[in-house]
Amino acid sequence: VGSGWPFGAEYLAPEEQVQMLYPVTVDVKGGRFTIGRDEVLGMANAQVANPRSNPTKELLFIRLMPKHVAHFTEGVSYDEQAGNDTITVDVPEGEHVLYFFVKLNGYSRVILGAPGASGPVVNHLDGKAVERYLDKFSDAMHFTRGKLKGEIRAAFCDSFELEGNNWTPGMFAEFEKRMGYSLYPFLPYVFQRTGAMGEPVREAYGCSFSPEVTRDVIERVRHDFWHVQMQLFKENFIDVYNAWCHRNGLKSRIQAYGHQLHPIETSMYLDIPECESWIHDGIGRVMEPNQYLSGRGYSMVNKFVSSGAFLANRNIVSCEEQTNVGNIFQTTLEEVKVTGDRSNLSGVNHSVLHGFNYSPRQKDFFGWIQFGTYFNENNTWWPYVRPWMDYKARVSALLQNSVYQADIAILPPLEDLWSIHGMQRDPYPGVTYPAYANDLWEAVQQSGNGCDYVSEKVICQSSVAGGRLRFGSRSYKTLLLMEVESLEPRTAARIADFVAAGGRVIAIGKVPHKGLGFRDAAAKDARVKAIIDRVVTTWPDRFVRVDAPQGDMLGWYRTLQAEYGLTPYAKISDLDRFMMMNYYKSGDRDIYFVVNSSIERSMQTRLEFPAEVAAKQAWVWDAETGVRHMLDMRNGTLELCLTPAEAKFIVFEKDRGGQMLPAPAPRSANPIALNGIWDVRATHHVDKSTREFSLTDLVDLHSLPFPWLQSFAGTIEYTRTVDVEDPAAYHTLDAGLTHNGITELFVNGEPAGVRWYGARTFDVAGKLRKGTNVLTIRVTTVLTNYAKARAADTPTAARWEWAQRLNKELGLRGPVILY
């Protein structure tokens, strides 16, 4: 819907445009102070990333505050002068701050909007403005009649970078109605200057507040104000959007995260919740702790979105996948696979590629590219995309018809985060709280368990019985409180009910001891503390506190798992941060999706399955080929080897009719190392020029003294002969390491397979002949070196030059062995 994001357009009336209350501050000392209103308005410039040049500004409130606030004071109001051309204040002796609260109207514009939808952002807290905006589309498109009727599945809405949309007419009345007290006295305590993408600016300004005022006033009122904004957003955008979609025969598909959206609950209201997975540098190679961007692929919001979807019993978890804002031309198809697999591990089962780059023929070679991986017929690896597409389709079909299993619920400290730091711009939060927040669910799934995030609302609406916390179709035996300090009393009471019914609660690092919000704070604090203290005293074995992890998250969780009997769905003998397992059920099938997301290492582990699962027939389903084989599994255990970037479905079902997985053929007693001279032919992808030379050793081709290689992209064919006395003794060719490319084998001129990820091993059984054989290994490189070389004369290549690593390692490195 619309163009660019967030929603907006040139035709919006002023009262429909995005609004912000922005604080201008001036330090003053004793005596008369005078300032012009125009000067104040001139200082009201929110440093947003996508500003409009001519926002409307209106001075609404003026407040004089002491510079150093040790105890709460409302300050002195000079609102009566807000309409004056000149503002005069008699300042008492000492240091003070004048706060001028300016309403900015239409201050931000649509990001990358096309003509007709590139003007000011619509006020997402104004339901009537949102509805008029949406109706303009449906009035023109006629979704419910004509050619489009029944042809459009869903209306899509991107994530919400609203950049500080904190105001709407009637905000004071809405706040008081919902929170039971007035927001007006707390203006200097709550409203902050907003910078890029809605994040608060880090500069010092205004008053300094004592720790007591920060704790007892600012954090509690801030919590309430964010909740009011969250409620208004749901009522005025999410509910309006849903209703508009359904009136027009459409499903709602939204990336429901950002400031003012609950990262779990908002996805529960949607027909198709969506998240996003990115290709960042290091995918498949690094996975640093407490660094949510480090090699993950999935964004930190994915687990929140998928949890909300599962809680709402949605069978589709959509994902904007393969988003790419830097590594455009150096991304390999192998990295695309790893990113997609990781996306699935975060709960995704419906991938929307970002994006196919369609360009007119008159554009340069690289064409139009905007934030997406280079899925384009001009890419070197485009001819090999189909195998990945088939693989992805099989994975998605299986997961969409299965249910992810989780018996551990994680309550993240969202309320504490919002109180202390404010709501965050997910999926790129300014603050991660606690530091390991996005690593905990990973460790759970890397250790064979399954988990969902839950919210306080979910807990309160859950039933408890038989040691389980039940919400809809979801059921949990264990609740992990992730450094949660604050709860609503009703949430604490429901947690107490869960423990009393036999459930287990593990409080990580901290034990809840206070309530939420400003009104009746002392009473709520006492109530929460009393409930939790009683639970700890009454059931010390079922409500336990453990130290927070320090460093080795996986080791910490393995200890927790063993000590508190967190029975995994399958016991994994050798844990690794790059190996993760998800467990699903489909009817009476038990489905394990096991992924090695390391591009560099194979993984060897032993899986031990529960007796009731192991009693069924075990199968391995190969999503790359669609082939299924039965497994000969003994004593409920399976020795599993995953080559780099490999994923397997291990499926248990009652059907025992099928072929057994063939045992690996024994290695030849006399393997042949293909050392010596290789004849090399390099064909440029763009101009089709060829170069030929010979190598005595397989090396990174950039180490050779050939200037043309510095800008090369295309295919490199390595050819040599090998004499084979007994062809039946050899069944595999291992091509070793390929630098950043796709590997293809030809034996005596006949195709013998393509390896676009993982181990470069080829089945050559029956393909060799006695005597001399001609082997050709074709490597298809990425575009990065060519793109770097074209930056001087091609705008698209120049735009992404900053992210391309010049002289990316190139070619076949081997060793090449026939066995």
Locate the predicted segments by residue.
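Carbohydrate-binding surfaces of carbohydrate-active enzymes
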Residues: 1, 20, 32, 140-154, ...
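Mature N-terminal, pre-catalytic/accessory segment of carbohydrate-active enzymes
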Residues: 1-152, 819
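An acidic-aromatic loop/edge-strand motif
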Residues: 2-63, 67-72, 545-546, 553-563, ...
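Short, hydrophobic/aromatic-enriched beta-strand segments in well-ordered soluble domains
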Residues: 98-103, 649-655, 718-720, 774-781
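Aromatic-lined ligand-binding clefts that engage carbohydrates, nucleic acids, or primary amines
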Residues: 610, 722-748, 755, 775-779
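Exposed aromatic-hydrophobic patches
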Residues: 637-640, 761-766
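Exposed beta-strand face motif in extracellular beta-rich ectodomains
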Residues: 648, 731, 771-773
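Aromatic-rich membrane-interfacial microdomains
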Residues: 751-762
